[in-house]
């Protein structure tokens, strides 16, 4: 199950070893070229002790489909585990842009997350349905910016702790926070997926990025390693 496995990691309930096993199972049993399925195999016999999900057609919606909304939780979970390559693999699979060359199968716009995509247990595997009718866009933005790019605002500190593919050498972003603007440059000279070696704020090495005066602009450089 996607949700329980991802949240075992995100909640901190699983230690790193068990968390990796949980997410390895997601990759092994639930990952598809269109994204991650909710569960596998799909329920095929109604069971009132389990509930409504067992009465949904196999591979559709809550029963074994690639339900878009919880997919970004898996990206975030992999970032917690420090596995940027897999987080990007999961991100790319669900991304509508990368499914545009499969439009005859997907049957939906290449600029909208859909509520769900038919899972492997359905004869129309890969067909997307209910574009825009989903909270997936918000969760995709949340997981991509706060976990993959690692830019996380807190009450009195701006955390920057990226988890990216090992072959990413650099990236940049602009983040407005508490009325100030931060021009962020991240470099990855050693080709790591996670870990911060140095933080520079306006060309001064610092341990953290505190709140800055509203209306000001600041340069931030993060060296991974």
Task: For every predicted segment, state its role.
Residues 1-12, 19, 23, 64-79, ...:
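Well-ordered alpha-helical segments within folded domains of soluble proteins
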Residues 28-32, 43-45, 55-63, 73-225:
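Non-catalytic C-terminal accessory modules of carbohydrate-active enzymes
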Residues 1-47:
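Extended ligand-binding clefts on enzyme/binding-domain cores
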């Amino acid at each position: 199950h996607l949700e329980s496995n991802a949240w075992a990691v995100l909640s901190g309930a699983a230690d790193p070893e068990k968390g990796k096993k949980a997410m390895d199972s997601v990759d092994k049993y639930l990952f598809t070229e269109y994204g991650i399925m909710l569960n596998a195999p799909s329920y095929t016999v109604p069971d009132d002790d389990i509930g409504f999900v067992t009465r949904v057609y196999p591979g559709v919606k809550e029963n074994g489909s690639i339900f878009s909304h919880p997919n970004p939780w898996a990206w975030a979970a992999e970032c917690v585990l420090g596995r940027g390559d897999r987080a990007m693999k999961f991100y790319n699979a669900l991304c509508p842009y990368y499914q545009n060359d499969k439009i005859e199968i997907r049957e939906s716009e290449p600029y909208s997350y859909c509520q769900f995509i038919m899972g492997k247990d359905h004869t129309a595997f890969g067909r997307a349905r209910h574009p825009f009718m989903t909270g997936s866009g918000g969760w995709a933005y949340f997981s991509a910016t706060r976990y993959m790019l690692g830019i996380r605002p807190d009450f009195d500190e701006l955390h920057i702790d990226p988890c990216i593919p090992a072959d990413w050498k650099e990236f940049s972003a602009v983040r407005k926070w508490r009325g100030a603007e931060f021009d962020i440059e991240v470099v990855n000279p050693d080709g790591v997926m996670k870990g911060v070696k140095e933080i520079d704020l306006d060309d001064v090495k610092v341990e953290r990025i505190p709140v800055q005066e509203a209306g000001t602009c600041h340069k931030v450089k993060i060296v991974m390693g």
